[in-house]
């Protein structure tokens, strides 16, 4: 028996409403998932954009941003592995990559949050050591140097050792980041000129201990 017209209209309206609700719900869920996926993808991209692929540390760009945002009570250290090219030449670039990752692990161990660690490129690294006193920050950085010097790495049946030279400068609100960086870079040059595998602070002149240098300028 045919359905009365009024009932058919009511059924049609009900079905349309149900179908519309289903479509709207499905569309809403789909859109929400797509937005979430895009947000996750963007976050991953931003993370990867700031990370050095080999070491897992921050890259130079992210380190520069961190330095710009550090306004004081911190030390900047610029470090360079000694004779790194000879490792690549003697053992191959895979061995060099292995050394870079091992050094990065040490940096992360001794200079994790709130400190900042980065691979600036090649065999060069950057650190921003926060808080404490100048002397304590210097001692932490030198602990990193000694730990790297003590490394004995086994790679492809061969034993590899390395060392690192470090230049340190002080960050303060009165100094522009590029000025601090240049001071740390000059200190690094002096560390390399002094025979490498050492740490030189911008306040240090010749063999004068850092503690005496700090007292002289305080």
Each PLM stretch: what is its role?
Residues 45-65, 79-93, 98-101:
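Conserved nucleotide-binding and Mg2+-coordinating catalytic segments in signaling enzymes
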Residues 75-80, 117:
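Active-site-flanking beta-strand signature of metal-NTP-handling nucleotidyl enzymes
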Residues 138, 142, 169-218:
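Catalytic-core segments of nucleotide cyclases and related cyclic-nucleotide turnover enzymes
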Residues 4, 14-53, 61-73:
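Signal-transducing coiled-coil linker helices
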Residues 46-47, 58-76, 104-112, 130:
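Short regulatory alpha-helical coupling segments
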Residues 119, 148-164, 192:
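Catalytic core regions of nucleotide second-messenger enzymes
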Residues 104-105, 136-152, 185:
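Alpha-helical scaffold within the catalytic cores of cyclic-nucleotide enzymes
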Residues 116-119, 123:
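A short pre-motif secondary-structure segment
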């Amino acid at each position: 028996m045919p359905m009365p017209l009024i009932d058919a209209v009511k059924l049609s309206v009900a079905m349309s409403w149900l179908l519309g609700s289903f479509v709207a719900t499905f569309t809403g869920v789909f859109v929400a998932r797509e937005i979430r996926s895009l947000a996750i993808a963007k976050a991953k991209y931003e993370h990867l954009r700031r990370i050095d692929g080999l070491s897992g540390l921050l890259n130079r760009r992210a380190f520069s941003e961190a330095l710009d945002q550090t306004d004081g009570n911190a030390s900047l250290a610029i470090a360079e592995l000694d004779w790194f090219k000879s490792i690549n030449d003697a053992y191959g670039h895979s061995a060099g990559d292995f050394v870079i990752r091992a050094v990065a692990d040490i940096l992360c161990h001794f200079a994790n949050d709130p400190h900042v660690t980065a691979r600036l490129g090649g065999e060069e690294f950057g650190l921003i050591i926060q808080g404490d006193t100048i002397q304590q920050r210097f001692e932490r950085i030198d602990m990193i140097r000694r730990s790297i010097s003590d490394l004995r790495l086994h790679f492809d049946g061969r034993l590899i050792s390395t060392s690192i030279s470090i230049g340190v400068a002080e960050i303060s609100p009165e100094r522009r980041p590029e000025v601090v960086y240049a001071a740390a870079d000059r200190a690094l040059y002096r560390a390399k000129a002094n025979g490498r595998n050492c740490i030189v602070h911008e306040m240090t002149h010749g063999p004068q201990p850092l503690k005496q240098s700090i007292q002289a300028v305080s």
